């Protein structure tokens, strides 16, 4: 591993004795139910936790565990369909905030207790400037004049280390990057010097290097202000390096809690042990010695024409997304492509399948030129080249049954002479992907995220391809489900001799699945080689930064 300083600032470790003082938040017996069409659903079942001044606690668990519902209960942000048990109490500095009036809660929220969310774009108003939104957050809870609030807003942007803060005040949310928008949300959350900051998956949608920057920023601001932090996440690397105390939730129940050090060293509950064991591990199986070349690309360049300027005199400019790229992919091989958002990795991958149009370069698949072919000329190759996307819910037609979704590809490519033959291939593909063959009449919304991704993989393998482009196929999944999909991809490759092009920002998954890796930055390849060599001994400063952000470094 790269010898370097810690990417994350170290957590201030609390002793068990430090938790004997009065808690700033003392939550007891929280139970939350939601009204649904045919009754009620228990989202949170009788949980309790404490938070102390200056401390960071992590509430961890997979999707549906109830961790975000717990946070929203504290903030008073539950929907009208939700009801909190009458025996529940949430004491903030000794006062039960569940008994507060709406007015009292509004005075507390964003003032003494603040919250930042996973996707800042959904929390920022797209029609107002950044400056006006921060000023509004300040003036709701203070008597500052507009001029004083504007000065305070500028100071906050400086504190969260946004470049060119004066210019950012006049910009709109869509003009900022994801990391910059999250910094704005932190500035707004801290605008009234809260005692508690609740961070609900604050870095999940961000690149690994930006994740490290945001978490270090929260830690630095916490030290300066003496805040307590509630961190809600499913990322155990972040939990280990960032929190002092951990609560583990599953199916709305508290499974285990302990200091971070003790919980990671000796987890007691089987579910906690399962979570810790779900971190991607292992490596790709060695390729057969006689593996020939399946796909090559040379000098690939992709650009888009973008509109710049005003409404009445827009100017068209060429934006070069990828420039002069090449690769070689062998049969039975998994080649990873990694890089931050905007690096061009997805654009490059899709250009190899002609899902977007390269303006230059050549792509050769199994000895045949792919570039320059018309749609009709590409059709014979489509069944041999398949793709699996990040979000299966977006790529599976919600109006079609699972059977129809998978059979559609067979019909289009003329595979299976009769309906019975096609349905047999559909069932075989589902079973190969770890799904039962009796789900053909069900719809995508009836399945979990992991099950939908298995269905998307089944749709791809039903056509018996030689090459599959996997575009972030595990990034939206919980850790344990992610591990299952990695095992499935390994199994299918071993059984069917598949070649994968695996696009990801998660270097842990890349290490577990790939033989070789390409590192991209700003549309160019900056480093490539065997996965262990690149991740253990990265040559470029950019790759070193990616590796430091992705792995725990002692």
Q: Where in this protein do the model-derived segments appear?
A:
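Conserved ABC transporter NBD signature motif
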Residues: 85-96, 361-370, 381
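Conserved ABC ATPase "signature" region
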Residues: 96, 148-167, 369, 420-438, ...
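Conserved ABC ATPase signature
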Residues: 171-176, 180, 443-447, 451
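Conserved catalytic motifs of ABC-family nucleotide-binding domains
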Residues: 193, 464
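A short, surface-exposed alpha-helical micro-motif characterized by mixed small hydrophobic
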Residues: 239-241, 510-512
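ABC ATPase "signature
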Residues: 254-258, 266, 528-529, 537
């Amino acid at each position: 591993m790269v010898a370097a300083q810690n990417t994350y600032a170290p957590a201030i470790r609390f002793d068990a004795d430090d938790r004997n003082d009065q808690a700033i938040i003392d939550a007891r017996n929280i139970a939350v139910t939601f009204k649904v069409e045919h009754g009620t659903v228990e989202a949170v079942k009788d949980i309790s936790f404490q938070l102390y001044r200056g401390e960071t606690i992590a509430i961890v668990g997979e999707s549906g565990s109830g961790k975000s519902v717990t946070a929203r209960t504290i903030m008073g942000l539950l929907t009208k369909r939700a009801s909190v048990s009458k025996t529940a109490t949430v004491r903030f500095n000794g006062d039960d905030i569940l008994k507060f009036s709406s007015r009292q809660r509004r005075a507390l929220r964003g003032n003494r207790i603040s919250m930042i969310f996973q996707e800042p774009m959904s929390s920022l108003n797209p029609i107002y400037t950044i400056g006006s939104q921060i000023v509004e957050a300040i003036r709701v809870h203070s008597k500052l004049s507009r001029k004083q609030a504007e000065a305070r807003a500028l100071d906050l942007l400086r504190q969260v280390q946004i470049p060119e803060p004066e210019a950012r005040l006049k910009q709109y949310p869509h003009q900022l990057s994801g990391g910059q928008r999250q910094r704005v949300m932190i500035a707004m959350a801290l605008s009234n010097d809260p005692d508690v900051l609740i961070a609900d998956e604050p870095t999940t949608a961000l690149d690994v290097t930006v994740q490290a920057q945001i978490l270090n920023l929260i830690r630095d601001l916490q030290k300066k202000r003496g805040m307590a932090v509630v961190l809600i996440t499913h990322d155990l690397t972040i939990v280990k390096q960032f929190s002092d105390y951990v609560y583990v939730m599953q199916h709305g129940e508290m499974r285990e809690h302990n200091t971070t050090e003790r919980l990671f060293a000796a987890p007691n509950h089987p579910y906690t042990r399962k979570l810790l064991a779900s971190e991607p591990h292992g490596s790709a199986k060695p390729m057969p010695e006689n593996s020939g070349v399946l796909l090559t690309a040379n000098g690939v360049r992709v650009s888009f024409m973008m509109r710049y300027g005003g409404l009445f005199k827009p100017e068209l400019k060429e934006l070069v997304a990828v420039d002069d790229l090449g690769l070689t992919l062998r049969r039975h091989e998994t080649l990873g492509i990694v890089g931050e958002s905007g690096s061009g990795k997805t654009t490059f991958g899709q250009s190899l399948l002609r899902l977007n149009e390269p303006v230059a370069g050549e792509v050769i698949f199994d000895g045949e030129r792919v570039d320059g072919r018309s749609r009709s000329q590409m059709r014979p190759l489509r069944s041999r080249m398949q793709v699996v996307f990040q979000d299966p819910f977006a790529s599976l037609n919600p109006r079609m049954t699972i059977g129809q979704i998978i059979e559609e590809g067979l019909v289009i490519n003329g595979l299976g002479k009769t309906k019975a033959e096609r349905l047999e291939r559909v069932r075989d593909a589902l079973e190969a992907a770890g799904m039962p063959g009796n789900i053909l009449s069900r719809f995508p919304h009836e399945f979990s995220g992991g099950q939908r991704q298995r269905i998307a993989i089944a749709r791809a393998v039903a056509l018996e391809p030689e090459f599959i482009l996997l575009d972030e196929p595990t990034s939206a999944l919980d850790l344990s489900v992610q591990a299952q999909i990695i095992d499935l991809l390994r199994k299918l490759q071993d059984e069917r001799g598949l070649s994968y092009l695996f696009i990801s920002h998660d270097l842990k998954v890349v290490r577990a699945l790939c033989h070789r890796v390409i590192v991209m930055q700003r549309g160019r390849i900056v480093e490539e080689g065997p996965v262990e060599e690149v991740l253990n001994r990265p040559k470029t400063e950019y790759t070193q930064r990616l590796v430091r952000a992705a792995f725990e470094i002692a």
